[in-house]
Amino acid sequence: RLILIRRFCALVTAGYYTIEQRSEKYRIIFLNTNLWLNTADNRMLHRFAGSMIDNAHDPFEQWSWFQKTLETARRKKETVYIVGHTPPGIDDRQSGAAVLSEHHNTKYLQVIRLYSDIIRGQFFGHWHTDTFRVVYSDTGLPVSWIMMAPSISPSTPGGPNNPGLRLYKFETTTGQVLDYTQYYLNLPDANSIGTANWLPEYSLLEYYELQEITAIALHDLADRFTQLNDYAFVRYYAANTVSLPREVEQIWGCGGPLNVVCALHHYCTVTRLNPESYKECYSSYALTFASTGPSTPRLYFSLHLLVLLVCAELLRYR
């Protein structure tokens, strides 16, 4: 009873808590990422006028609680999933924009690396887009994944999307996430007929031709974004905007038609989860493209091939 009281107090006071499936040894940790936002976006900071929120240290002692909870889970040999609102990393709709403060973004990634042996996956939202992220070890190995489902709200500062709902399939005894089905509402059609008709958009494993949901599998998927002979990025981008009509997507998406720069931006946001590493990723690849020269036949052929693949895939899936 005392444990329940403490958890309730933490939830009411600061919005974070954990639940356990003790018989099967898995745990879900719910974080209040509002406590870790940068100063401009931190509503909690404005609400309390800074008196109870120190954004440079440990607001409401969430970090201390988070790491103690992970230590307990490791000692009990539990599998852990993490749920929050605002994810670490860069907004894929707004180049280079991060919402968590630099301190908390860096610390979060460090904690995930440290406990990657028990953290099976992470679930976030906030950006309204259908996307994912891969967390890497200090030596560059993929060690954890983040799933971000699109929102029901059809609008976002970075561009619109159709409303989306996601249903995860998981193994009840271990908590292992096996797959998910993404549903969407075709908003123009719904407005036209006056009825909401939710339809399956895709299933993760089939859509991206994956065998399982792991950090390595999602790393390989992101790597396919940079390969000109692969449809992965075209499919990803269609899902990213929740099957937005092409005429709307052309206005908002990547500043126009899909291209190498667009694919590069999304590849770097998926695989580089802090502003500096994102900038380094984007700059290094952009420099590689630029060094080939605009008149190089090989580059021209590659870009032409990419356009043909994009057109073929859009005709196939739209």
Predicted regions and their residues:
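Active-site-proximal segments of metal-dependent phosphoesterases and phosphodiesterases across multiple
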Residues: D41-S64, E71-F124
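Metal-dependent phosphoesterase/phosphodiesterase active-site architecture
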Residues: R1-T72, K76, T129-R318
